[in-house]
Amino acid sequence: MQKKLQVEAIEHGSVIDHIPVQQGVKIIRFFNLTQTNEKITIGLNLATHTGQKKDLIKVENTFISDKQANQLALFAPHATINQIKDFKVVNKFQVQLPDSFIDVLACPNSNCISHHEPVDTRFYVKKKSTLKLKCHYCEKTFDHLFFSELD
């Protein structure tokens, strides 16, 4: 059986692979990738070699930083980042869930002081397996799904 690319190759840039189904569009929104002039290719519900489905994002002429890669773990904890130069993978790494997120997310608790005072939001990762985050200020713990729709 001949292999066939489901999404066009890029010359230079980043490929975010192994994104869970229905998370690709959320990642595009979260990172404001629609605000760039670079070509963005997104594959949704692509078949994997195991017969499962995944999403995939390719961003030309843009390289994902370590900080951005770690933020991706909120949406895709098993995603990999491929850095492409001259159509070849020059670096490949898996996202790593950081111990904390600073000034990335808004607290879902509307009574949290972070909504009323000029402070940077701060969340600590309390449980990595099911991804639970604890707010530094109100000390409430939230499932990561509370954050998946935030802009």
Swiss-Prot record:
Gene3D superfamilies: Aspartate carbamoyltransferase regulatory subunit, C-terminal domain, Aspartate carbamoyltransferase regulatory subunit, N-terminal domain
Subunit structure: Contains catalytic and regulatory chains.
GO molecular function annotation: metal ion binding
Cofactor binding note from Swiss-Prot or TrEMBL: Binds 1 zinc ion per subunit.
Cofactors that this protein relies on: Zn(2+)
Function: Involved in allosteric regulation of aspartate carbamoyltransferase.
Cellular component per GO, a single term: aspartate carbamoyltransferase complex
Superkingdom in the source lineage: Bacteria
UniProt name for this protein: Aspartate carbamoyltransferase regulatory chain
Any Gene Ontology biological process: 'de novo' pyrimidine nucleobase biosynthetic process
